Amino acid sequence: DDILILERDKELGGILNQCIHNGFGLHTFKEELTGPEYAARFVQNAETLGVEIMLDTMVLAVEGHRVTACNTEDGLMMLEGKAIVLAMGCRERTRGAVAIPGDRPSGVFTAGTAQRYINIEGYMVGKRVVILGSGDIGLIMARRMTLEGAKVLACVELMPYCNGLNRNIVQCLNDYDIPLYLSHTVTNVEGLHRVEKVTVAEVGADRKPIPGTEIVFDCDTLLLSVGLIPENELTRK
């Protein structure tokens, strides 16, 4: 049967294209690859099998076995298939999703957005950084920001344990002397045009901040690595 992949980006690979660190492919290919290299292996396999690919194509709706999509070359398209596979990944939780109080200046980024700015677009997002969340993307960005010349003041985690892999704790935090604050969270963001201060406080067993435990960091950037939300809007009809 014929297979068609619809991709809204200009290239296949998704988030892997901005994950330029190594560590991919050990189980599947028995060698260590970067994210783009890992994605390229699967793209090559798909092309070898004759899979049709349409890039820069936006899917607008999925109704039964019918897909409505569009791009600049073909315009609006109505496609039908025997089976439809949704592989849309997820998006990051934002500041609003986790209700961080305080001012709303520039300098607050999700970790994945900062990663794309640095690794793909070539923009440095800040010089003095606090990271909320200790998932793997947060840990990897702590290292990446340090390698690009920024000072990572703290990695802050709400839970009493780190959510990232042990190897990332060692390679991304310990190796660069970046402090990890467990059972802490961000309680305030200050700044007029740009982030100027971030307040961090310890939390109790109820995950609520404990008065009197506040630490204020003078910084210009807050990165959020606070979880992912499935990109499933197309399934709601």
Predicted ranges, named:
Residues 1-237:
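Residues forming the flavin
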